[in-house]
From Swiss-Prot:
The gene is fabH2. GO terms for biological process: fatty acid biosynthetic process; secondary metabolite biosynthetic process. One of its GO terms (cellular component) is cytoplasm. It comes from Deinococcus radiodurans (strain ATCC 13939 / DSM 20539 / JCM 16871 / CCUG 27074 / LMG 4051 / NBRC 15346 / NCIMB 9279 / VKM B-1422 / R1). PANTHER family: 3-OXOACYL-[ACYL-CARRIER-PROTEIN] SYNTHASE 3, BETA-KETOACYL-[ACYL-CARRIER-PROTEIN] SYNTHASE III. Keywords: Acyltransferase, Cytoplasm, Fatty acid biosynthesis, Fatty acid metabolism, Lipid biosynthesis, Lipid metabolism, Multifunctional enzyme, Transferase. HAMAP family: FabH. Disulfide bonds: none annotated. This is Beta-ketoacyl-[acyl-carrier-protein] synthase III 2. The last Arg residue of the ACP-binding site is essential for the weak association between ACP/AcpP and FabH. The active site is at C119, H255, N285. Homodimer. Its main location: cytoplasm.
């Protein structure tokens, strides 16, 4: 699915993030599993990740990220009448995590629902929010990516425990001046690769003889090959739909899964690695939260300038993929509260 976009211009008005306090270093796993700091860092780029406290669910993390946004950008939540949360670790099947976030941030009464597309979820949620604003069904939308992945993985499994962390990020989207905002979206999925990355659900039906535990399971080799290919393909397609090429990218904001995947994308695009926003060394793979976390951090550091060409790209369970091209508007985002 692709979309090339025109008036009204809709873009990012505010950003926010939250990471739990507990820092889990590679040394933690080196003492428990057959691994080492060097092994993890050299293969993934991850040095540490955050784990949520027992009382920090995905809705709590999402609320705190939204509070961070509201503190940095006073008035940004005014007029928001749609809340979408991308998560694979919801508080419950229902009520939706989005509804709980809305209730905890003064947005009670706003339309609210969750999107579940694993690590691609934030891009899917962005596209849905964009479409609802374009259709006149919403004025402004709060899009949240929030995950407690530490509870979804087996902490004794070296193949997954070392990769994932907890956190939340969010954006408010709405109308921006012409020439700014989202230019294109590319989304897709192929269930043929579904068995390579899955997390058992409460109502899951399995073929006879299939073995699946309660935790996230990943075929790392196959997911890596898929990610390298689709991240590059979807990014090129999104830029093409926007009337651009990858040579026009000022900042790549990718899903934070593995530094090797990001390096491969940069090499393919001829983009210096310094122009890719990365924080997986400190947060690990936070699934649907990774792109908004990276956006919020880069914005706070003043890395994005007015008119910069951004490319957001991700991949995840499904197997799924997504990308979005946008022209950064530093209007509200350049006027955050100190």
């Amino acid at each position: 699915m692709t979309a090339s976009l025109s008036a009204p211009a809709i873009g990012i008005l505010a950003v926010g993030a939250y990471a739990p306090a507990a820092v889990i270093t590679n040394a933690h796993y080196a003492t428990r599993l057959d691994t080492s700091d060097d092994w993890i860092t050299s293969r993934t780029g991850i040095r540490e990740r955050r784990h949520a406290a027992p009382d920090e669910s995905s809705s709590v993390l999402g609320i705190r990220a939204t509070q961070d946004l509201a503190g940095r950008f006073p008035g940004a939540l005014d007029g928001v009448n749609l809340v979408i949360c991308a998560t694979s670790s919801p508080d419950a099947m229902f009520p939706s995590t989005a509804a709980l976030i809305a209730g905890g941030t003064g947005l009670r009464g706003a339309a609210a629902f969750d999107v579940s597309v694993a690590c691609s979820g934030f891009l899917y949620a962005l596209s849905v929010g964009y479409g609802m604003i374009r259709a006149g069904l919403a004025k402004k939308a709060l899009i949240v990516g929030s995950e407690v992945m530490s509870g979804a993985v087996d902490q004794n499994d070296r193949n997954t425990a070392i990769l994932f962390g907890d956190g939340a990020g969010c954006v408010v989207i709405g109308e921006v001046p012409q020439g700014y905002g989202f230019q294109s979206f590319v989304l897709g999925a192929d269930s043929a690769g579904g068995p390579h990355l899955y997390l058992r659900g409460a109502a899951l039906r399995l073929p006879e003889g299939t073995e699946m535990g309660p935790h996230l399971t990943q075929n790392g080799r196959e997911v890596f090959k898929f990610a390298v290919r689709t991240l590059g393909d979807s990014a090129e397609q999104a830029m093409r739909q926007a009337g651009k090429t990858t040579a026009d990218i000022d900042w790549l904001v990718p899903h934070q899964a593995n530094i090797r995947i990001i390096e491969a994308a940069c090499e393919r695009f001829g983009l210096p690695i310094e122009r890719a926003v990365t924080n997986l060394d400190r947060y690990g793979n936070t699934s649907a939260a990774s792109i908004p976390l990276a956006l919020a951090e880069a914005q706070a550091q003043g890395r994005f300038k007015d008119g910069d060409q951004l490319l957001l790209a991700g991949f995840g369970g499904g197997l799924s993929w997504g990308a979005a091209a946008l022209k950064w508007w530093s209007g509200p985002t350049g006027k955050q509260s100190s």
